[in-house]
Each structure stands twice: as C-alpha cells, then as structure tokens.
C-alpha cells in the first residue's frame, strides 16, 4: 500500500498530470462523434450552396436568355444580396451551433472570414460569400468560404471554393 504522506510534490504533480491526460483522452473520445456530426452538417450546407451556384452557371451557359432561380437575367451581373436571400428562403441550411445570425452572409473577403486571419473573429458554420456582385464576364470569380470548426485557420477546419462563370 502506498502511504500518501510519503509522496513528494513531484510525485503528486506527475500523478495529476497523468490523470489530466487520461481524462482529456476520455473526453475527446466521448465528444468526437458530436463534433464530426456538426462538421459534416456545415460541410453539407457549404456544398449545397456551391452546387446551387454551379448548377445556375451551367444552366445559364446553355441558355443565356433565361433567368436564374433568384430572378436575374443569366447574361447580366448577379447580385450577391439576391443570391443570399434566395439561399436563405429556398435551401434548408442546418444550424448545428444554434447560430442566431443568418447562416449565409456576404463578406468583402470570404477567405478572411472563413480562415479567421488578421484577428477577425469568425462564426463557425456561417457561409460567407463575396459581397461584390458576380460579374457576367467569362472567368469572373466568386468566393464561398465557411469555418467548420475552431481554430478556423488550421488546415482542414475551413472550406473555401472559387466559383467561375
């Protein structure tokens, strides 16, 4: 039997450190599934928005005289605000983090918002799209970015896609 009164400060510190590591490993194991579920929901939201835009681009490249699903002419510049409003009204976005703000928003630079650079605070689960309108010229770029888990700047913790017309 170990006599606790004979344990020194170093032994107690080692014991507490080992205990802390074991508790953290157990906690990580128990919560991993919930985190993965949230991450997958956010990635699905991101994918649905990107697919909507790509489908509209493909539809409009085949028939430039028709209108987009949000009501703009295919051959004109597309309003980022109208696209965001259309997504909010017509695509079911899952909200795993109970975010109070809209799940898709415009940002001057979605990369900064999705990666959390330059001290920007980011919202996990929010899809950020370029606030500049999507120009009608061939090769015009529009960026869609999402932070899926903290820290957003870490590899694999964000989704960034450039969409071209």
Can you describe what each PLM-predicted range is?
Residues 4-50:
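Amphipathic alpha-helical segments typified by the pilin-like N-terminal helix
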Residues 44, 54-57:
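Juxtamembrane non-transmembrane segments of integral membrane proteins
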Residues 58-165:
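Periplasmic/extracellular, small/polar-rich flexible segments of pilin-like filament-forming proteins
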